[in-house]
């Protein structure tokens, strides 16, 4: 949207504007990156981090200094791998050995790759990959070992997928294949990140023993993206929804995008959402095992965005027409909720689980299972943070408000006050700008008296001889 369209939108959605302003003005990072002590190659790495992903760049750059550079190098290494895998112009005989041997290039001084097509988005990262290698070699041995191990696993997984796509069919057939694909492209990131957290003593070592927890962290994000991007992927000739699911609802995958099959398509998307929701409980469990605030923020923000995106996509026909995203104001509100504490984050999850449950319909073949999945999220949160204690029950009987309820009422009153203030301020701005524009028009000779006479006659358009006159 343009500036004028944005201004018009936020006049009618002031609460979203308030969330954006709160995040932009009052958000204080737990840690701030200190560029004064960085080498030139490190600065180049952070430049590429900004170019490859603004969202991940923002959360990575707020990490504890101990993990700041290791996580940046980890992300750029996997992004380089992904850039090779995504480029369909690279033949399999070149791509496969590159992917399988990418872990080894991390030890080769000066290595780079110029074989990507010119339009490839992150081509320049690989052209200047020697900067990443230089900084990789300066990391602690334990961090280097984690990055190399995950790079090897992901490279082999991507190579297997590329070979299958070239020799057979790139589409995903079974739910098991779907989970395996998501594991290679996202679950391994969860494993690597967890190992880095534990190595830095910012995560509970027990997280490494519960592989299903960090696996779910990655799969929940990846599956949400696959659900949201179904139209975009289809237009690009890619198909990630497993045939085992969509074949229950339509004959051919492309039938999902036909208007006459809309109800079947919605039921299919509901089953995809259900498949993703089953990871939510384990994600919440994982987040409880993080010990450092910036690491918690790093993990919590994407997860809260994912549950909000699932709620947006659930039984929403728009996903079969275009790529949809949560609103910017809602995203800012979620980021504020995800950077405070576990209880507030869990409440955000509870809110969106209830939204999904509310939109659920008995017409959906998965109605019961979706209800159970939402209830499991509620039950888990209630187990960790009970909503009612004996003291709370007694207070309710007496009609007294708890401190939390009083604080919530105060914040709601403050929000209403802020919203009214912003609406009044925007009204004043509109009036002021209108007066200034009218004043300028009058100063430069505008005849408002003649315009008024024409309006009184019922003429709301200029005379025909003026409209048709050539300038």
Curated annotation (Swiss-Prot):
Cofactor(s), by name: Mg(2+)
UniProt feature coiled coil, ranges: none
Membrane topology of the entry: Single-pass membrane protein
GO molecular function: squalene synthase [NAD(P)H] activity
UniProt subcellular location: Endoplasmic reticulum membrane; Microsome
Catalytic activity of the protein: 2 (2E,6E)-farnesyl diphosphate + NADH + H(+) = squalene + 2 diphosphate + NAD(+); 2 (2E,6E)-farnesyl diphosphate + NADPH + H(+) = squalene + 2 diphosphate + NADP(+)
PROSITE patterns documented for this protein: SQUALEN_PHYTOEN_SYN_1 (PS01044), SQUALEN_PHYTOEN_SYN_2 (PS01045)
Keyword tags: Endoplasmic reticulum, Lipid biosynthesis, Lipid metabolism, Membrane, Microsome, Steroid biosynthesis, Steroid metabolism, Sterol biosynthesis, Sterol metabolism, Transferase, Transmembrane, Transmembrane helix
Entry's Gene Ontology BP terms: ergosterol biosynthetic process; farnesyl diphosphate metabolic process; isoprenoid biosynthetic process via mevalonate
Pathway as given in its UniProt record: Steroid metabolism; ergosterol biosynthesis
Transmembrane segments: 420-440
Pfam families documented for this protein: SQS_PSY (PF00494)
GO cellular component, one term: endoplasmic reticulum membrane
Superkingdom, taxonomy of origin: Eukaryota
InterPro entries in the cross-refs: Isoprenoid_synthase_dom_sf, Squ/phyt_synthse, Squal_synth-like, Squalene/phytoene_synthase_CS, Trans_IPPS_euk-type, Trans_IPPS_HH
EC numbers, comma separated: 2.5.1.21
PANTHER family: FARNESYL-DIPHOSPHATE FARNESYLTRANSFERASE (PTHR11626), SQUALENE SYNTHASE (PTHR11626:SF2)
Function, as annotated: Squalene synthase; part of the third module of ergosterol biosynthesis pathway that includes the late steps of the pathway. Erg9 produces squalene from 2 farnesyl pyrophosphate moieties. The third module or late pathway involves the ergosterol synthesis itself through consecutive reactions that mainly occur in the endoplasmic reticulum (ER) membrane. Firstly, the squalene synthase erg9 catalyzes the condensation of 2 farnesyl pyrophosphate moieties to form squalene, which is the precursor of all steroids.
Family named by the database record: Belongs to the phytoene/squalene synthase family.
Other noteworthy facts: In Aspergillus, the biosynthesis pathway of the sterol precursors leading to the prevalent sterol ergosterol differs from yeast. The ring system of lanosterol in S.cerevisiae is firstly demethylised in three enzymatic steps leading to the intermediate zymosterol and secondly a methyl group is added to zymosterol by the sterol 24-C-methyltransferase to form fecosterol. In Aspergillus, lanosterol is firstly transmethylated by the sterol 24-C-methyltransferase leading to the intermediate eburicol and secondly demethylated in three steps to form fecosterol.
NCBIfam families for the chain: squal_synth
Name of this chain's protein: Squalene synthase erg9
Organism whose genome encodes this protein: Aspergillus fumigatus (strain ATCC MYA-4609 / CBS 101355 / FGSC A1100 / Af293)
UniProt lineage: Eukaryota, Fungi, Dikarya, Ascomycota, Pezizomycotina
Gene from which this protein is expressed: erg9
């Amino acid at each position: 949207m343009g500036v004028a369209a944005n201004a018009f939108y936020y006049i009618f959605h002031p609460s979203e504007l308030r969330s954006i302003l709160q995040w932009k003005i009052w958000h204080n990072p737990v840690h701030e990156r200190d560029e004064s002590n960085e080498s030139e190659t490190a600065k180049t790495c952070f430049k590429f981090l900004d170019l490859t992903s603004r969202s991940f760049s923002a959360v990575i750059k707020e990490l504890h200094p101990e993990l700041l550079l290791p996580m940046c190098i980890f992300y750029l290494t996997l992004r380089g791998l992904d850039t090779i895998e995504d480029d369909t112009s690279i033949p399999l005989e070149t791509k496969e050995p590159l992917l399988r041997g990418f872990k080894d290039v991390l030890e080769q001084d000066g290595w780079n790759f110029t074989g990507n097509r010119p339009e490839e988005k992150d081509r320049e990262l690989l052209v200047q990959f020697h900067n990443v290698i230089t900084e990789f070699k300066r990391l602690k041995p334990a961090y280097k070992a984690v990055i190399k191990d995950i790079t090897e696993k992901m490279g082999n997984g991507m190579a297997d997928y590329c070979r299958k796509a070239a020799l057979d069919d790139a589409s995903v057939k079974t739910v098991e294949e779907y989970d395996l694909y998501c594991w290679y492209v996202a679950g391994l990131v969860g494993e690597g990140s967890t190992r880095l957290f534990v190595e830095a003593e910012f995560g509970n070592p027990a997280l490494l023993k519960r592989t299903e927890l960090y696996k779910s962290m990655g799969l929940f994000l990846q599956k949400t993206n696959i659900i949201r991007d179904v139209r975009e992927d289809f237009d690009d000739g890619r198909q990630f929804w497993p045939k085992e699911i969509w074949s229950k609802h339509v004959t051919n995958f492309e039938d999902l995008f036909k208007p006459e099959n809309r109800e079947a398509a919605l039921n299919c998307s509901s089953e995809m959402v259900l498949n993703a929701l089953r990871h939510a409980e384990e994600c919440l469990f994982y987040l409880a095992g993080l010990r450092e605030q910036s690491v918690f923020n790093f993990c919590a923000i994407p997860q809260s965005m994912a549950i909000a995106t699932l709620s947006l996509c659930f039984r929403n026909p728009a996903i079969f027409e275009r790529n949809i995203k949560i609103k910017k104001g809602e995203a800012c509100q979620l980021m504020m909720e995800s950077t405070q504490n576990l209880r507030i984050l869990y409440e955000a999850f509870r809110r969106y689980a209830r939204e999904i449950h509310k939109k659920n319909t008995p017409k959906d073949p998965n109605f019961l299972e979706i209800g159970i999945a939402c209830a499991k999220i509620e039950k888990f949160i209630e187990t960790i943070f009970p909503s009612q204690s004996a003291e709370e029950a007694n207070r309710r009987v007496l009609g007294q408000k708890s401190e939390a309820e009083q604080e919530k009422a105060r914040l709601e009153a403050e929000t209403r006050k802020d919203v009214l203030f912003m609406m009044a301020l925007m009204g004043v701005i509109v009036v002021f700008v209108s007066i200034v524009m009218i004043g300028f028009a009058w100063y430069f000779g505008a005849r408002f008296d003649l315009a008024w006479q024409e309006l009184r006659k019922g003429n709301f358009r200029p005379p025909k001889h003026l409209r048709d006159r050539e300038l």
